[in-house]
């Protein structure tokens, strides 16, 4: 009987733990999540592709219960002109945003993929800002000369701001055998500056290298990215370096 009761108690205990949350924590179309935390509140942004309003923003205090508080793109004048969402294709639009917070300002950096009827596919990397993540958000600041997709924005502790990007080694606007690159970014002019440095080709030959995110902990830079495409070979890789411009050492346990 004691054996039975002990196991019943354990089962009930584990059941209680399991019922505290269920995956997915957000049901529906919320791919490519990016999160930042400010004063104990978590803010989440996701890809929205061709849909409008775009860039849904959720807020949570526990990473389990989320409230939709607004959209990064909710005005027509944010989505026409260079940053065109008016007639974007069903496989285009807003991909893999990153949300960051620095000195009182929220930033979202992302790519709009647009394929005109005539001409090559365009990869438009841009940033929007807000003091309140619920909105309103600024007009898009287009980062000219930034190739590739899925950019990250990194604020270093020396005051420098870095654009972390990806591009194809052969065609800088394709998504084949890729590499990751970093370049300093001037947020007063919304322009890249200085030298662009290719820093890593991933752990599996750079196939479909995408979604980079830069972190820094105890003086070491950690560069995380996805690789292998979006099917069975999709995997997460990470590498480390003492300098943001590399060289980066791939984790031997990748992928």
For the regions a protein language model found, what residue spans apply to each?
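Carbohydrate-active catalytic/glycan-binding domains of CAZyme proteins
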Residues: 18-255
């Amino acid at each position: 009987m004691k054996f039975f009761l002990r196991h019943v108690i354990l089962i009930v205990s584990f059941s209680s733990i399991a019922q505290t949350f269920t995956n997915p924590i957000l049901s529906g179309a919320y791919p490519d999540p990016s999160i930042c935390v400010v004063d104990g509140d978590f803010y989440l942004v996701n890809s929205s592709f061709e849909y409008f309003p775009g860039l849904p923003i959720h807020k949570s205090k526990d990473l389990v219960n989320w409230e939709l508080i607004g959209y990064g793109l909710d005005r027509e004048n944010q989505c026409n002109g260079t940053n065109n969402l008016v007639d974007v294709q069903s496989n285009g639009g807003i991909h893999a945003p990153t949300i960051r917070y620095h000195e009182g300002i929220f930033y979202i950096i992302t790519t709009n993929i647009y394929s005109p009827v005539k001409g090559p596919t365009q990869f438009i990397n841009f940033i929007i800002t807000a003091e309140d993540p619920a909105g309103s958000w600024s007009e898009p600041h287009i980062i000219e000369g930034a190739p590739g997709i899925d950019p990250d924005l990194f604020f270093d502790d020396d005051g420098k701001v870095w654009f972390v990007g990806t591009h194809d080694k052969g065609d800088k606007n394709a998504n084949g055998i890729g590499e990751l690159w970093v370049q300093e970014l001037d947020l007063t002019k919304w322009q890249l500056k200085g030298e662009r440095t290719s820093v890593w080709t991933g752990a599996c030959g750079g196939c479909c290298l995408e979604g980079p995110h830069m972190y820094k902990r105890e003086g070491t830079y950690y560069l995380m990215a996805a690789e292998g495409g979006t099917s069975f070979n999709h995997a997460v890789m990470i590498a480390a370096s003492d300098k943001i411009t590399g060289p980066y050492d791939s984790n031997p346990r990748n992928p």
